[in-house]
Amino acid sequence: MASQSTANPNVLSLATIGSVARLLTLTGATLTTGLISGFFYAYACSVSLGFALLPDEQYVEAMQAINATVRNGVFTFSFFGAVLFLVLALVIYAPRMRSLRFLLIALAAVLYIGGGFMATFLINVPMNQELALVSSDAAPATPAQIRAEYEGPWNFWNGVRTVFSSLSFLALIGACLSRSDSG
């Protein structure tokens, strides 16, 4: 008598679920990292250049307004989502840690978390918080002094996080294109 398989063809196999999980986490990491690197890039090549043309008082007010509104759901999804998806991708691809794909994901995680994410948290956000405390009525420093201390360093560190986030995005594109999923 021939043995019949008891597997239900309508049930996804663990291998299929694993493949889908790997695809979704790598796609999520690539998408969110691309979005946030594009956000930082747009700031560097348009917003900062436009703000450079503003008089000092308007510059301070404009930066305060943007900093007050940037914390929203769309930004949160890309900024924190990149960390979440990168970590998930590392965990899911860990059994394939000798593969080129895993190494590129690990490189992307180090670049984004160590460069883009941490620069934002350790430097740009504290600078933004200090700027938020400045009141045009009660400021001990003039808008020109405030701007002189803020603009150059803030733009420099935005450039740093732009470069690191963009390199992370490129590493993830490499991971997506890699045919090596075993090692």
For each predicted feature, which ranges?
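Interfacial loop at the N-terminal end of multi-pass membrane proteins
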Residues: 4, 9-13, 35-80, 126-152
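Interfacial segments of alpha-helical transmembrane regions
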Residues: 17-33, 91-115
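Hydrophobic residues within alpha-helical transmembrane segments
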Residues: 31, 80-84, 160-163
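Hydrophobic residues within the alpha-helical transmembrane core of Major Facilitator Superfamily
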Residues: 34, 87, 114, 170-173
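Structural signal for membrane-spanning alpha-helices in multi-pass inner-membrane proteins
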Residues: 40, 86-93, 120, 172-176
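Hydrophobic alpha-helical transmembrane segments
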Residues: 76-90
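Hydrophobic alpha-helical transmembrane segments of integral membrane proteins
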Residues: 107-129
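A hydrophobic membrane-anchoring alpha-helix module
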Residues: 162-182
